[in-house]
Amino acid sequence: YVYEYEDDYIGDIGGDVKWSVSPNLTLDLTVNTDFSQVEADNQRINLTRFSLFFPEKRDFFLENAGFFSFGGGSSGRGGSRMGGGSTVQGFHSRTIGINANNQQVPLYGGGRLTGKVGKWSIGTLIMQSGSLESAAGSEVSPSNNYIVGRASYDVGERSRAGVLFTNRQASSTDYNRELGFDGRWGINDQTTVDAWIMKTESPHLDGDDFAGQIQFDWGSPRFQVRGAYLDVGDNFNPEMGFVTRTGIRAIDSSFYWTPFFPDSRYVRNLSPHVMYRHTIDRGGELLSKYAHLDWDMFLRYGDKVSVAHNRSYELLELPFQISAGVIIPPGVYEWGEVNLEFQSDAGRSVDGSFNYTTGGFWSGDRSEIRVQAGWRPGSRLSFALSLNHNEIDLPEGAFETDLASLRADLDFTTEMSMRSLIQYNSQQDMMLANVRLRYIYTPGSDLYLVYNETQVVEGSGLVDRAVLFKATYLLRF
């Protein structure tokens, strides 16, 4: 084949200012915010009908991110989805500067104020993005203004109440707003109740735009109990947050028992536990069920052995294309699977894990193998290998998926380091490479040399290649 390419040389300059307004309050200002040195996202295989949640990796948004945290409970925000449940997050900073197609959008700049004022924890953020155009000149993403306001008040030692407001606005007819209230009631050292409620406003949606959750947690050294109820309206649309599934009501529960064996030479403790999630639509029809029974055994020297059994129920209302040419028809599906897992102590110079899952899957069967291995030959060099292989056999068609990554980190000196990540995703037919060289020439001042490449394994070949150089200099005043 003949590869036609176009070279683009782009330069820009930006800056950040950090000002300690008070001992507990910090103001950050940024102009032409740049994230070229940020590590690439970890590739994932998606065998569900729902969008995947990717964590924030950009330092500017990770710094003081806790001041924008909303909700408190864990079953309805962040984390992994169980049995078709919904992940809900009031504010997710990845919505700023990254569009729905995972494309970088230029950021003109903005400001952030975070910290403590008495019993108040506050976080405010204002950012302005530019527009993004395609190669043909059409607008892919419009310029947007983003505003986030978060305040939380401590009530005693264990309780708090707070409010969250977000606003994304491109024009008078293109906007999204969200208002939320949350609270935590710490009844005692063992018992907490978390609750939140949110409402969104979008010009093209009207009514049924609320979401809320209440969660109960009780824990002791040997027992942990959790119960949660989640309600998400059909038109709930947090464009500056994240929601996996709307129009549902879900009950989520779990029970953990953790017996310890101080006299055993081999077993430190066990952690048998059960989880159950029950999801219905707004009319009361059952959408999904998920039951998880697990037996974890933690060994004296840091290793872990686990055996689990999962049962799933899914109501599929629309055809679901799970792979190219493989479409699962609407209907009710039930299946079970068994999972075996071994993890070695991560503190060793050589560590790893092995995970094997086999059983039913929608209308057929699935087997999955996941292997991870790490090697640290010295204090300055480390390698991490991850492999994931799925074999899926359905009446509608059979297919396989593969996901692989190799990470290598090398610290030449305390001032110079290199971080490399190579990934392969068969679902996207992509091979990706991200190599970052960093040199700290004075404390707080850095030089970065970054190489990124994306290739289609079968087909057109090279998709994108970029070599980036970035210099930062810290001025103290």
PLM regions and their residue ranges:
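Outer-membrane beta-barrel channel domains
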Residues: 1-264, 309-314, 465-469
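Exposed, low-structure sequence patches enriched in small/polar residues
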Residues: 106, 196-477
